[in-house]
Regions:
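N-terminal Sec-pathway targeting helices
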Residues: 2-12
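Eukaryotic helix-grip
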Residues: 26-219
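Bacterial N-terminal signal peptides
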Residues: 11-20
Length: 219
């Protein structure tokens, strides 16, 4: 191992240690490894471009969802668009996000942020979460230590919320993989949430692709 490291450029070795340090500070929830595993997913919907699968995790009464889309858009552009949480209302115009922003940043690869959802016929939900970017992957988990002063109107806070964006190169194309486990809280029939996710997740991935293709410029 030592001989291998001697052959690597110093900047590459430093990047490895920085990656380990940053990822070790991010708090991962119970059920994270199960969400990321490719096993036991059940395909429930397939459009001409998007596949939706579900898996039941013990940490939520609702199934976790995985959405996948193959895109001609550059993977770096897609990841950059997914990282722009403050522009969520522009990136995801069909997601019923009415406000979003960053509470505070920890460097360029980590932030604590929020998204305010106002879905018709339901009470608004305020999602507060910690996000970390690892290359073209983004991991997030519900933030438990945010002051109540950031929620003066006492909007409902979902008790479970974690997931990831993963953008992979696929030859001359990219594949977007979105995984999420959430319990929005409140008295919502499970079947309504499941149907809503099956309807809006495909739109969300296509909206991400559209924004990345039209708005993101790589330097």
């Amino acid at each position: 191992m030592y001989k291998l490291f001697k052959k690597l450029p110093l900047i590459y070795i430093l990047s490895i240690f920085i990656f380990i340090l940053i990822s070790s500070e991010h708090q991962y929830p119970q059920g994270w490894d199960e969400l990321q595993s490719n096993e036991e997913w059940e395909l429930v919907k397939k459009t001409d471009r998007v596949q939706i699968s579900i898996k039941q995790l013990n940490v939520s009464p609702l199934p976790a969802f995985k959405a996948e889309l193959i895109s001609d858009v550059n993977s770096d552009k897609l990841a950059e668009a997914a990282w722009l949480v403050a522009k969520s209302t522009e990136v995801f115009p069909n997601a019923y996000i009415i406000d979003a922003g960053v509470y505070y940043k920890q460097g360029v690869t980590s932030y604590t942020a929020f998204q305010l959802f106002d879905i018709p016929f339901l009470s608004p939900r305020l999602y507060q979460f910690n996000s970390i970017r690892l290359g073209n992957s983004i991991h997030w988990n519900r933030a438990d230590t945010i002051s109540s002063s950031y929620n003066p109107d006492k909007i409902l806070l979902p008790p479970v919320n974690f997931g990831s964006w993963e953008i992979q190169n696929l030859g001359h194309q990219s594949i977007i993989i979105y995984r999420v486990c959430t319990d929005p809280g409140g008295d919502i029939p499970i079947w309504i949430v499941e149907q809503a996710n099956q309807r809006y997740l495909p739109l969300m991935l296509i909206d991400l692709e559209t924004y990345a293709n039209k708005k993101i410029v790589l330097y």
